[in-house]
Each structure stands twice: as structure tokens, then as C-alpha cells.
């Protein structure tokens, strides 16, 4: 019995430390993946990046960070679901078609990572200002870089 009571405090300490390490490590990995995806997306110049998207980032002053990430994921999902087979985005050449498919794949990856970071099941998105997908992704990249600098320091 005495041995068990002596082992409990160190075990709790190890569990607490491991949980903090994993959480911080996950934060870094997820943010790195999001930033990497955003870098790839913003380098691409496709027909779809000039189309408009609901700009939830412009009106995110009274929302939590998790709500912002959730809403960003929601509008990205709405965008790629609507434009996945959009003939304006597919282009006339095989290269344009390939770039469009790559864009959709990156948007889906970004959506999945933002949902994971948000940790919410759903979030309402009100119609707000419109922005091009290109500008939306640039602003989201700035937000993620700021979060990464805070997370890693």
C-alpha cells in the first residue's frame, strides 16, 4: 500500500507533462501543415482563386479563435463543394484541369486541419462581405503565422 501512494504523485506529474507536450506538439504540427497548405494554395494562380468567397475573417472581431477557424473551414467547404465541378474553374487545357483538381485537394486538406484546430462540431456562418479566394487565403495565412509564432514561443 505504501508503495502505491508513493508512486501516485510522480505518475500524475508524468501524465500532466506528457499531455502538455503532446498538446503543444500537435499545435505545432497542425499549424505547420496549415501554413504549408496555405503557402501552396497562395502560390497557385487558377481560375477559381479569383472567384468570391464569404469573408468571415473581415468580421471576426467578436468571435473566439476556435469560432474563426470553424467558420473559415465552413466557408472553404461551401466554396470547394460548389466549385469542384464548376466549368469556369476547370479550364480548357489539361494543365488548368490538373491545377484545379490540386486546388480542390488542398482546400479539402485545409478544411480538415481547420476543423481539427477548431474542435467544434458546427458553427453558423452569416452572409458577410465577399472577398476573392486568393485574398481570403492570404489573410488566413497571416493569422496562422501569427498563431504559430505565439504557439512556438
Curated annotation (Swiss-Prot):
* GO MF assignments: cytokine activity; growth factor activity; interleukin-4 receptor binding
Keyword Glycoprotein tagged: yes
Disulfide bridge map: 27-151, 48-89, 70-123
Pfam families cross-referenced by the UniProt entry: IL4 (PF00727)
SMART domains in UniProt: IL4_13 (SM00190)
Q: Does the keyword Secreted apply?
A: yes
List, alphabetically, the PANTHER family matched: INTERLEUKIN-4
What's this protein's function? Participates in at least several B-cell activation processes as well as of other cell types. It is a costimulator of DNA-synthesis. It induces the expression of class II MHC molecules on resting B-cells. It enhances both secretion and cell surface expression of IgE and IgG1. It also regulates the expression of the low affinity Fc receptor for IgE (CD23) on both lymphocytes and monocytes. Positively regulates IL31RA expression in macrophages. Stimulates autophagy in dendritic cells by interfering with mTORC1 signaling and through the induction of RUFY4.
Stated name of the protein: Interleukin-4
Organism lineage string: Eukaryota, Metazoa, Chordata, Craniata, Vertebrata
Amino acid at each position: 500500500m505504501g508503495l502505491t501512494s508513493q508512486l501516485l504523485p510522480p505518475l500524475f506529474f508524468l501524465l500532466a507533462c506528457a499531455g502538455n507536450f503532446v498538446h503543444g506538439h500537435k499545435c505545432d504540427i497542425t499549424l505547420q501543415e496549415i501554413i504549408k497548405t496555405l503557402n501552396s494554395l497562395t502560390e497557385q494562380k487558377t481560375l477559381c482563386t479569383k472567384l468570391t468567397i464569404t469573408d468571415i475573417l473581415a468580421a471576426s472581431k467578436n468571435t473566439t479563435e476556435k469560432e474563426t477557424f470553424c467558420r473559415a473551414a465552413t466557408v472553404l467547404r461551401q466554396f470547394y463543394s460548389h466549385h469542384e465541378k464548376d466549368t469556369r474553374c476547370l479550364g480548357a487545357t489539361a494543365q488548368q484541369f490538373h491545377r484545379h483538381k490540386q486546388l480542390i485537394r488542398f482546400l479539402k486538406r485545409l478544411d480538415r486541419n481547420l476543423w481539427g484546430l477548431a474542435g467544434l462540431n458546427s458553427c453558423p456562418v452569416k452572409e458577410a462581405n465577399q472577398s476573392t479566394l486568393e485574398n481570403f487565403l492570404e489573410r488566413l495565412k497571416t493569422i496562422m503565422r501569427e498563431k504559430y509564432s505565439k504557439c512556438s514561443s
